[in-house]
UniProtKB/Swiss-Prot annotation:
GO terms for cellular component: chloroplast inner membrane. It catalyses: K(+)(in) + H(+)(out) = K(+)(out) + H(+)(in). It is found in: Plastid, Chloroplast inner membrane. The gene is cemA. This is Potassium/proton antiporter CemA. It comes from the Eukaryota.
Length: 229
C-alpha cells in the first residue's frame, strides 16, 4: 500500500524537479522588459554609483591611455585630435551601456530566483503529504537493504559528492548557480565556496553516521568504515 502511495507521489516529485526551470524561464521573459524600463527611467542618472564608477573609470583610463599612446606615436593634425576625443566619448558611452545591461541582467535574474524559491517553498508546504509518503517509502526501501549494500551506497554517494574527485563537479555546479543569479564569473568566490561547502557537508555526514546510523545499525557503521579505509 505504501509503495502504491509512493508511486502516486512520483508526479509530484517530478514537478518539484522541473518546476524551477519552468518558473525561471517564464519569469525571466516577463520580468526583464519591466526591469529594463524601470532601470532606464529611474536609475539611469545614478548608474555611476561607487562600484560602477570605479569599474568604468578603470576601463576609461585604459582606453584613454591607448588613445594617447597612439597620439604620441603618430603626429596627428588637429582634425585627428578631434576624432580622438570623439572616439573616447563613444567608447565611454558604450562602456556605460554595457554596465547598465549587466545590472539589468543581475536584477532580473536575482528577482526571478527569489520568486522561484518562494513559489517552490509554498508548493512544497502544500504538498507536504506527498513528501512524507515519499520519505517513508525511501526509508523503508533503504532499511530493507543488507548492511553491505547500504554501506556501499553511502560510500558511493559520498565519494561522488564530497570525495577526492568532486571539487571539479562542485566548481561547475556553484558556477552555474552563480551565473543563474546573474553575477559575472568570479574565480576567487567560486574557489572559496568549493573549498568550504563540501567540507561542511562532509562534517554533517559524519555526524549523521555517528549519531543516526550508529544507533539503528552499529554493524553498518563498522562495514562503512572498513570499506572507506
Amino acid at each position: 500500500m505504501s509503495k502504491k502511495k509512493a508511486l502516486t507521489s512520483l508526479p509530484y516529485l517530478a514537478s518539484i524537479v522541473f518546476l524551477p526551470w519552468g518558473i525561471s524561464l517564464s519569469f525571466n521573459k516577463s520580468l526583464e522588459p519591466w526591469v529594463t524600463n524601470w532601470w532606464n527611467t529611474s536609475q539611469y542618472e545614478t548608474l555611476l554609483n561607487e562600484i560602477q564608477e570605479n569599474n568604468v573609470l578603470e576601463r576609461f583610463i585604459e582606453l584613454e591611455e591607448l588613445f594617447l599612446l597612439d597620439e604620441m606615436i603618430r603626429d596627428y593634425p588637429e582634425t585627428h585630435i578631434q576624432k580622438l576625443r570623439i572616439g573616447i566619448h563613444k567608447e565611454t558611452i558604450e562602456l556605460v551601456k554595457m554596465y547598465n545591461q549587466d545590472y539589468i541582467h543581475i536584477i532580473s535574474h536575482f528577482s526571478t530566483n527569489i520568486m522561484s524559491f518562494a513559489i517552490l517553498s509554498a508548493y512544497s508546504i502544500l504538498g507536504n503529504e506527498e513528501l512524507v509518503t515519499l520519505n517513508s517509502w525511501v526509508q523503508e526501501f533503504f532499511y530493507n537493504l543488507s548492511d553491505t549494500i547500504k554501506a556501499f551506497s553511502i560510500l558511493l554517494l559520498t565519494d561522488s559528492c564530497i570525495g577526492f574527485h568532486s571539487p571539479h563537479g562542485w566548481e561547475l555546479m556553484i558556477g552555474s548557480v552563480y551565473k543563474d543569479f546573474g553575477f559575472s564569473h568570479n574565480d576567487q568566490i567560486i574557489s572559496g565556496l568549493v573549498s568550504t561547502f563540501p567540507v561542511i557537508l562532509d562534517t554533517i555526514l559524519k555526524y549523521w553516521i555517528f549519531h543516526h546510523l550508529n544507533r539503528i545499525s552499529p554493524s553498518l557503521v563498522v562495514i562503512y568504515h572498513s570499506m572507506n579505509e
